[in-house]
């Protein structure tokens, strides 16, 4: 059971039982080469299989026997046979790491690219085992490094999913595909991001992996990183993208990552409009122009329209060419919706040499409106001179949407006018529109050929667009109009467009209009147009009526124009409208012209069917030359009904010229009401004749005109109905004008041809009906038209149809109608077969999913069991550790005891040295037999002691070795743990450093501007402070000068006092002079005092100013602090805004996920409807699954029984070992007892000796003490041995407990098998219920089919 539930990598070994094998297999398993040689010599089949479909080579490779493999290979054994798991011997050898066997097989030509049941090759298992040498050998022998099944990983993806970094690096070096994807569209980068493997992500980015690849759910690796909140990986991918954009060339003008991230914001709608118009005018020498545009847009809005129009006109150099006003008006009509356009026009004039111009633009715009339009208009006009010119334009557009509606319209209109020599024009357009839901591709290729006499010209136009959408609306229109001829030679233009597109929903509409023809000179040409639409759908019905016929004849030269078109449009939504109208009318004076107008509007009713009408009626005759119409025109010019219920194309026509365009929703609703009878009608009612000569019409043409005249009443009725239903819109007026104009033309033609009416016969009408039925049989919706034609003919001819000829013809028409019904039934049967196949595939996938779920549940159960086993193993390890600790403690005790004994022996030796002479004298005296006995006893004791010492030394050496090994193991474990801890710490520190560096860079970037502003303010303040300091220094210098003066004045004053004394002593008579001098001095002192007061006042003023400046500085510091607080508040506000932004972004993502879930629910509903028919298959499959489950259960029970037996055998062996150990311990105990008895005898002898030698000295007392100590040591050893015996007994009891536990597990497994049987019974009941439901559904389907038959009859 475990083997069946494995993932292919677990349980690689074969589960072998003897009754599975045959003789050759047994010989291989036993390794008996001689028997194998004998069997091979007796012509025994070397490729014989056992009951498990294994060959001898399989077993030899699985068991790793290269000699056996060499022998089998030399006997030409088949190397590529598979076992039950579809595994070859090579796969088995690689899986089990048998490199020698694998190399032998590879050297002898084994195929390494064969896959097993799981879709894996030998390379997958080598990658899983991380066997690099084996991988190199496989690759050298031609292994495909990308080989795998659809549902399996490639080797590189397997290495990534298993987190094998070394193997990823090795495979990348071996040039594995980095951009490989799995069945869910996930690349290696997406897998690595989901697993959170940073190293693998770095490796993949180093090897330039595609970062923009999306999986089935439309998600990028960056999206998964953001969902997982793995900041490191997200930053790595973001930096890689930024570097890629920086490394792009200058002309490419890449979109910056900020813009890309802004495009993913929470805006409801986005508009991306880019219009490029390039006009290149060339001279006599050719020029090359290439324009590329790659816009990338993403929107989460309600509607999104993408319009791309390319109009290229190549005009002659010397001849004049003009564009008709009708064409200009048709090009203007496409842009009736709300479109914002960005026009970029580059014009490059080429002189005498060729030039190359490349323009690339990648706009990304974002708006918050409800409806968005994305228009891409490119118009290139190239004028050629005398020589040939080559123009190539490429356009690549990638638009992504998860919205409700998408429209994609591409209009191509090219006109070619050639001069004297040939020219080649190639235009390519490659738009790619992507949606996050299910998407498909569509391609259309256009080729044209022109032949001119001896000179051949080729015009190739390719258009491979890939349109992908799962939204509600999708418009795809291709309009191509191109025909011009010159000279007197006939030319051929072939126009092909074979696109293949698929539709999986309700309806498809494809409208293609091709019309343009011109005549020159006195020549006419023949125009034959064919249209072959190929539409594929799994919807209810698809109708398409291709009818085009325009022919004109001339006298001298005839030309043919063939136009083939195979459009296929894919839709997965409710409504689709695709309208394109390019009418052209070219009228010349004396020359004849051909006008071809085609209109195929497609209106969709809420019912299942739809109608597709194409009307082409153009025939203009020349004035001077009489033209004829061949009889091949009959099937194209016909009518399909005269009743009032059938509606002509007048109710569906859209005005040509400036009034042509898309249809309004009001008109659509009105037309849905009118066209309830699901009629497809083809009317050709435009015939204009002119000129100077008389022309005659053959009856073939007149019959068709008669039929169209009879349809006049129905046409007028439909026009009046349209008036009543619709409101007054411009589309209504267009329909009324069209119906009135057609009515007038038909009445004029009827008045001019009265005789032709009377010549119409029933035979001709019946021929027309037969031919019309043949043409309409190409499409599936022409049956009701044939029925109505027959009824109308019977109503017209009334009683004239009673003759046998007419009745036979009517019967023939009915037979043809029945044949058509049979053809349609066959087509329906084919579709049913396809649907059944798809349902079978879906049931198989569901089986696989259920099996995988069962495997997952079993794996979880196994994981729990393994965890239990791990717990038990951990407990056993802990017990072993405890045992080792006990052993170490015993070892230490033994060593201590040995040390003590050695010390005692040394003491005894020291004591015995002085006693030796006394002993010698005693020995001389004691020459009796007692002396001999004493000598014998001493020699025996010495031998015993030596033997014990040797045993103890051996045990000590053994214990030391064990201790050293245990210590080394513990140290290694500690070092490994420490190394891992250091590694983790180092990684965490590196991560923290990176994060801190990133945060620092961000904070530096944020605060750099603020710091700059603050530094500016600080510089201004510092300049002011410096000025104030300078002024203060000046004041201080002045104060110092004043102080110097005061000091000088004081000195003068002192000197004056001294002089005064001297003068008083010297000159007593000069008192008057002294007084005078005193007065002078007083006056000077007053002056100086005044100056001092002034200086003090100035110093006070300066102090006040300093105080004021200090206060101003304090105020500025407060202002600075206030500014800092405001900055902090702003930062907090910014953080809050960022949080709000993140929350809004999360809500937007949730809305997108809800929309995706809604789409998925729709798809699931469709799948559930389809699964009703598969119920029977499921029932059968469930029965098979139940049988398989029973087989698996039996195998599981058998495996468990075998495992239990093995476990029992192992336990029995363990018990035997324990018993042997117990016996061994008992023997040791007996030996110890014997030794104890001998020692007791020796002690008694020593006691006797002690009594004899008490008089000789006190040395014997020390010997007795040593012997007593030795005895105590032996007793301790006995106790330790008893403890060991107790431990062994406890282990034996634990083993018995384990046996009982295994027995309980077997009983539980038996209970599980009973539960599975009960579930089997329940499943059978459920299958019976489902069978009843299937029978009810079949009855309902039969009833519905009968009702449908009744309605059809």
UniProtKB/Swiss-Prot annotation:
Residues 731-762, 821-908, 937-1055, 1119-1344 form a coiled coil. The keyword Coiled coil applies. Gene3D superfamilies: Ankyrin repeat-containing domain. GO terms for molecular function: identical protein binding. Residues 250-259, 355-367, 389-400, 579-600 have a biased composition (Polar residues). Belongs to the ANKRD36 family. Residues 249-307, 349-607 are annotated as: Disordered. The gene is ANKRD36B. This is Ankyrin repeat domain-containing protein 36B. Residues 260-272, 295-306, 436-455, 471-491 have a biased composition (Basic and acidic residues). ANK repeats lie at residues 19-48, 52-81, 85-114, 118-147, 151-180, 184-213. Keywords: ANK repeat, Coiled coil, Repeat. It comes from Homo sapiens (Human).
């Amino acid at each position: 059971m475990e083997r069946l539930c494995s993932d292919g990598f677990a349980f690689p070994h074969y589960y072998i039982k003897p009754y599975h094998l045959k003789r050759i297999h047994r010989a291989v398993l036993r390794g008996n080469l001689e028997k194998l040689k004998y069997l091979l010599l007796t012509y025994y089949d070397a490729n014989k299989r056992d009951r498990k479909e294994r060959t001898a080579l399989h077993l030899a490779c699985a068991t790793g026997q290269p000699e056996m493999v060499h022998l089998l290979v030399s006997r030409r054994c088949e190397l590529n046979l598979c076992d039950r798991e579809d595994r070859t011997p090579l796969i088995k050898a690689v899986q089990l790491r048998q490199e020698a066997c694998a190399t032998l097989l590879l050297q002898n030509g084994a195929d390494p690219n064969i896959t097993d049941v799981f879709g894996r090759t030998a390379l997958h298992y080598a990658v899983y085992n991380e066997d690099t040498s084996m991988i190199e050998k496989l690759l050298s022998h031609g292994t495909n490094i990308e080989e795998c099944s659809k549902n399996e990983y490639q080797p590189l993806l397997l290495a990534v999913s298993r987190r094998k970094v070394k193997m990823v690096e090795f495979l990348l070096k071996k040039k594995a595909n980095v951009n490989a994807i799995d069945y869910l569209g996930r690349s290696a980068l997406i897998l690595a991001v989901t697993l959170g493997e940073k190293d693998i992500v770095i490796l993949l980015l180093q090897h330039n992996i595609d970062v923009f690849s999306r999986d089935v759910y439309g998600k990028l690796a960056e999206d998964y990183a953001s969902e997982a909140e793995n900041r490191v990986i997200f930053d790595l991918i973001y930096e890689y993208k930024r570097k890629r954009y920086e490394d792009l060339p200058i002309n490419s003008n890449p979109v910056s990552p900020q813009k890309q991230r802004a495009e993913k914001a929470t805006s409801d709608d986005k508009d991306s409009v880019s219009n490029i118009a390039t006009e290149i005018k060339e001279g006599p020498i050719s020029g090359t122009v290439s324009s590329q545009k790659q816009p990338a847009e993403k929107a989460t809005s309600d509607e999104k329209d993408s319009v791309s129009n390319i109009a290229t006109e190549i005009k002659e150099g010397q001849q004049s060419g003009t564009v008709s006003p009708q064409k200009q008006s048709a090009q203007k009509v496409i842009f009736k919706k709300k479109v914002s356009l960005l026009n970029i026009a580059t014009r490059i004039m080429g002189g005498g040499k060729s030039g190359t111009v490349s323009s690339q633009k990648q706009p990304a715009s974002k708006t918050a409106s409800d409806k968005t339009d994305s228009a891409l208009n490119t118009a290139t006009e190239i004028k050629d001179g005398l020589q040939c010119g080559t123009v190539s334009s490429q356009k690549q557009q990638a638009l992504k949407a998860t919205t409700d509606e998408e429209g994609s319209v591409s209009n191509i209109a090219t006109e070619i006018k050639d001069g004297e020599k040939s020219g080649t024009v190639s235009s390519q357009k490659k738009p790619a529109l992507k949606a996050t839901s299910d998407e498909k591709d569509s391609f259309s290729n256009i080729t044209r050929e022109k032949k001119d006499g001896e000179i051949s010209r080729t015009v190739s136009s390719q258009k491979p667009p890939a349109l992908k959408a799962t939204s509600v609306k999708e418009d795809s229109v291709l309009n191509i109009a191109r025909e011009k001829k010159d000279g007197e030679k006939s030319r051929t233009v072939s126009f092909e467009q074979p696109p293949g597109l698929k539709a999986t929903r309700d309806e498809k509409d494809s409208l293609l209009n091709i019309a343009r023809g011109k005549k020159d000179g006195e020549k006419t040409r023949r125009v034959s147009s064919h249209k072959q639409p190929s539409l594929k759908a799994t919807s209810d019905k698809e109708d398409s009526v291709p009818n085009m016929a325009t022919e004109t004849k001339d006298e001298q030269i005839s030309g043919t124009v063939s136009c083939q078109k195979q459009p296929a449009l894919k839709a997965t939504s409710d409504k689709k409208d695709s309208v394109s109208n390019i009418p052209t009318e070219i009228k010349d004076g004396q020359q004849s012209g051909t006008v071809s107008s085609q209109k195929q509007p497609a209106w969709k009713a809420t019912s299942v069917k739809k109608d597709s009408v194409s009307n082409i009626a153009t025939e203009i005759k020349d004035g001077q030359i009489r033209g004829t119409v061949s009889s091949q025109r009959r099937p194209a010019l016909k009518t399909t009904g005269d009743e009032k219920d059938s509606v002509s194309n007048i109710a569906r026509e859209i005005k040509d010229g400036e009034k042509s365009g898309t249809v309004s929703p009001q008109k659509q609703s009105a037309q849905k009401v009118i066209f309830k009878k699901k009629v497809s009608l083809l009317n050709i009612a435009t015939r204009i004749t002119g000129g100077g000569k008389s022309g005659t019409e053959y009856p073939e043409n007149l019959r068709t005109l008669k039929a169209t005249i009879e349809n006049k009443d129905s046409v007028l009725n439909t026009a009046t109905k349209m008036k009543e239903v619709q409101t007054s819109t411009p589309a209504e007026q267009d329909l009324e004008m069209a119906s009135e104009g057609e009515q007038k033309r038909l009445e004029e033609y009827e008045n001019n041809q009265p005789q032709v009416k009377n010549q119409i016969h029933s035979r001709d009408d019946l021929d027309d009906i037969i031919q019309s039925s043949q043409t309409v049989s190409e499409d599936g919706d022409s049956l009701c038209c044939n029925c109505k034609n027959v009824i109308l003919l019977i109503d017209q001819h009334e009683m004239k149809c009673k003759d046998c000829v007419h009745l036979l013809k009517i019967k023939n028409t009915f037979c043809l109608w029945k044949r058509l019904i049979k053809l349609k039934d066959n087509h329906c049967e084919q579709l049913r077969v396809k649907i059944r196949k798809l349902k079978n595939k879906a049931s198989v996938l569901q089986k696989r999913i259920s099996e995988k779920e069962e495997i997952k549940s079993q794996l979880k159960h196994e994981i729990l069991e393994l965890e239990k086993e791990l717990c038990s193993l951990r407990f056993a390890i802990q017990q072993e550790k405890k045992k080792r600790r006990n052993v170490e403690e015993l070892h230490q005790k033994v060593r201590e005891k040995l040390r003590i004994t050695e010390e005692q022996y040394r003491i005894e030796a020291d004591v015995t040295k002085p006693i030796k002479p006394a002993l010698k004298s005693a020995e001389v005296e004691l020459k009796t037999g007692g002396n001999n006995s004493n000598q014998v006893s001493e020699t025996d004791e010495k031998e015993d002691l030596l033997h014990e010492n040797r045993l103890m030394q051996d045990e000590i050496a053994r214990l030391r070795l064990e201790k050293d090994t245990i210590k080394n193991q513990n140290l290694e474990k500690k070092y490994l743990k420490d190394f891992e801890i250091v590694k983790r710490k180092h990684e965490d520190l590196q991560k923290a450093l990176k994060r801190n560096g990133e945060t620092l860079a961000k904070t530096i970037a944020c605060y750099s501007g603020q710091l700059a502003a603050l530094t500016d303010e600080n510089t201004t303040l510092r300049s002011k402070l410096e000025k104030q300091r300078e002024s203060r220094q000046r004041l201080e210098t002045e104060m110092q000068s004043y102080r110097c003066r005061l000091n000088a004045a004081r000195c003068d004053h002192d000197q004056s006092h001294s002089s005064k004394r001297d003068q008083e002593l010297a000159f007593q008579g000069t008192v008057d002079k002294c007084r005078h001098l005193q007065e002078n001095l007083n006056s000077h002192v007053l002056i100086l005092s005044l100056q001092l007061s002034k200086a003090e006042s100035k110093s006070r003023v300066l102090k006040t100013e300093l105080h004021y400046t200090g206060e101003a500085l304090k105020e500025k510091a407060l202002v600075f602090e206030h500014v800092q607080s405001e900055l902090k508040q702003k930062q907090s506000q910014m953080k809050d805004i960022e949080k709000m932004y993140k929350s809004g972004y999360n809500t937007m993502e949730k809305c997108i996920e809800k929309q995706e879930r809604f789409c998925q629910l729709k798809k699931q509903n469709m799948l559930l409807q389809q699964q009703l028919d598969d119920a029977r298959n499921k029932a059968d499959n469930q029965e098979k699954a139940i049988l398989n489950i029973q087989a698996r259960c039996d195998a599981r029970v058998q495996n468990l029984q075998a495992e239990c037996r093995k476990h029992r055998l192992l336990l029995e062996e363990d018990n035997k070992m324990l018993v042997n150990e117990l016996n061994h311990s008992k023997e040791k105990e007996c030996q110890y007892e014997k030794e104890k008895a001998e020692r007791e005898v020796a002690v008694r002898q020593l006691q006797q000796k002690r009594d004899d030698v008490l008089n000789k000295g006190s040395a014997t007392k020390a010997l007795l003490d040593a012997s007593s100590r030795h005895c105590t040591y032996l007793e301790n050893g006995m106790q330790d041995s008893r403890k060991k015996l107790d431990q062994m007994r406890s282990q034996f009891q634990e083993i018995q407990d384990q046996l009982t536990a295994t027995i309980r597990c077997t009983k539980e497994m038996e209970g599980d098998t009973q539960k599975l049987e009960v579930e089997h019974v329940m499943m059978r009941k459920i299958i019976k219920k489902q069978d009843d439901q299937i029978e009810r559904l079949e009855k309902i389907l039969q009833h519905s089919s009968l009702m449908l038959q009744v309605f059809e009859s």
